A protein has these predicted regions:
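Bacterial N-terminal signal peptides that target proteins for export
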Residues: 4-23
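Residue-level hotspots at or immediately adjacent to binding/recognition sites across diverse folds
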Residues: 34-343
């Protein structure tokens, strides 16, 4: 009778443990994948944000105030709302525009009682009485691109940037405009202006960014820092840049004079949603927001982050975070979502 094979016990052990190992592998994969769709961050004990109900399903895109209490909120589908209590409540307004045109009001700015609204397609409005009345300024048909960002600069003065990076300035209430850049930057997905007049833009495909400052004849092109396409860029309070990229990555530029210098990528949370904007509140806390109610804050320069308990309850994508010089703050979201800073 042949001796029993020495390999049989080992084979029996393999058959015994194989289902167990498979189960452990499935569980490990489950937990690993679950980490991509759960928060992984602690939620703050309280929130400085208060939801503000809006009687609209349009997307708020920009907000500006004439004084401490009176202001306007504009957005898609000709949305314009007015507040007289600092943004705690809003009432719908109407603009005298052709009904067949579904304008997207994308930018608004005030300098005292003089206001400007930029919209698409081809819309520019001006008010001299705090927004009670608006007059339309007809733009040159040869204007490169569509109006994208309007900045009020003082009495009868404003600066208009388009979605291809053309920059124009008026000093006579919009009757004439002077080009500030010789060549446009090309199609952009995002464009921001600093308080001292510098611009940063992200290319339409997110594969590079460009900068421009007063006195330069053309935009300066810069390559992105990683394989991840760029989403949004803007300016930190000290004038240096910040960057949001696909894959929920964010970076900070440590030197405002060198847009090629960047810190390491920071990924606060991997919940499957990217970030769409970033801003600094009056206390210096950094806020970033994005898809599916993602609203995070960091009080240590981006090293650690917390989820905001009010933000995560909102069924929306946060697209813009705005803090005014006087301390007012708002988070704008899709489908009529708005949060107001209450400190």
């Amino acid at each position: 009778m042949p001796a029993p094979s020495a390999s049989r016990p080992a084979g029996s052990l393999r058959r015994l443990f194989s289902p167990l190992l498979s189960l452990l592998l499935v569980l490990a994969l489950g937990f690993g994948l679950g980490g991509c769709v759960t928060t992984g961050l602690a939620s703050s004990a309280d929130s400085p944000w208060q939801p503000v109900p809006l009687a609209t399903t349009a997307n708020p895109l920009a907000v500006a105030f004439t004084d401490d209490r009176h202001g306007f909120l504009v957005g898609s589908n000709r949305l314009i709302l007015e507040t007289d209590d600092g943004g705690a409540s809003w009432e719908e307004r109407a603009l005298d525009l052709p009904e067949e045109e579904n304008f997207r009001l994308i930018s608004i700015a005030f300098s005292g009682q003089e206001g400007w609204i930029a919209g698409q397609p081809g819309l520019l409005l001006r008010s001299t009485d705090g927004g009670q009345n608006w007059s339309r300024l007809f733009l040159d048909t040869k204007l490169p691109g569509e109006p994208y960002l309007i900045t009020a600069l003082g009495r009868s003065s404003a600066e208009l940037a388009t979605n291809v990076g053309a920059v124009y300035q008026t000093r006579d209430g919009g009757n004439s405009w002077q080009a500030r850049v010789e060549d446009a930057a090309g199609a952009v997905r995002e464009l921001r202006r600093s308080v001292d007049g510098r611009y940063v833009s992200v290319s339409g495909l997110g594969n590079f960014f460009s900068t421009w400052e007063p006195g330069q004849p053309t935009w300066q092109v810069h390559q992105r820092m990683s394989s991840q396409r760029l989403q949004t860029m803007g300016f930190q309070p000290d004038g240096a840049l910040w960057m949001l990229a696909r894959g929920a990555q964010l970076r900070f530029n440590p030197d405002a004079a060198d847009p090629e210098q960047w810190g390491k990528a920071i990924i606060p949370i991997t919940n499957g949603y990217g970030y769409l904007d970033m801003a600094w509140d009056p206390r210096g806390t950094i806020w970033t927001g994005g898809g599916s109610g993602t609203l995070l804050s960091s009080s240590d320069g981006g090293r650690t982050w917390q989820r905001d308990p009010v933000g995560e309850q909102q069924p929306t994508n946060f697209t813009r975070i705005v803090f005014a010089a006087d301390g007012k703050g708002f988070v704008l979201g899709e489908r009529g979502s708005l949060l107001r800073w209450v400190g």
